[in-house]
A protein has these predicted regions:
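N-terminal anchoring/stem segment of glycosyltransferases
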Residues: 1-78
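The conserved acidic donor/metal-binding loop of glycosyltransferases
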Residues: 106-110
Length: 137
């Protein structure tokens, strides 16, 4: 099944206005493992991001990880979105850009085996729940 990662850099730049964009090495490793394991076990994957993220991945030679391409579609996100409060909004915009059925996969989620049997039938599925943190939400 088609999957996608997403990366919206605006929250990074809001928190770090004078820094060059970067991702911690361990996060790059989990991203690589996530994409490669998904491809091996479940199918194609793409990256939906913005231009700074695409340029960053290109500079590191990592675009090969996403066999279905790297698309800077998040450049069109409205400027009035509060990137501090809604730091994950890029995921929703990415989800709206990918035809269903699809899997929205966090870059730190590694799928070690096929999950096709879990995805046959339901209209929507979630691997896990996340607690709502009042200090964040």
């Amino acid at each position: 099944m088609q999957a996608f990662h997403s990366n919206w850099t605006r929250p990074f730049f809001i928190r770090n206005p004078h820094m060059e964009y970067r991702i911690e090495p361990f996060e790059l490793l989990t991203t690589a493992l996530s994409a490669l394991e998904w491809r091996r076990e479940n199918g194609s994957i793409r990256m939906i991001c913005d231009t700074p993220a695409k340029r960053y991945y290109e500079s590191l030679g990592l675009c090969f990880l996403w066999d279905d391409g790297v698309y800077p579609l998040l450049d069109t996100m409205p400027e009035d979105i509060n990137a501090t409060a809604f730091w994950a909004a890029g995921k929703l915009y990415a989800l709206s850009a990918v035809p269903s059925p699809c899997v929205m996969l966090d870059t730190d989620f590694i799928c070690w085996k096929s999950i096709s049997n879990l995805l046959d039938g339901p209209d929507t599925a979630a691997i896990h729940r996340e607690d709502i943190m009042p200090s964040i939400y």
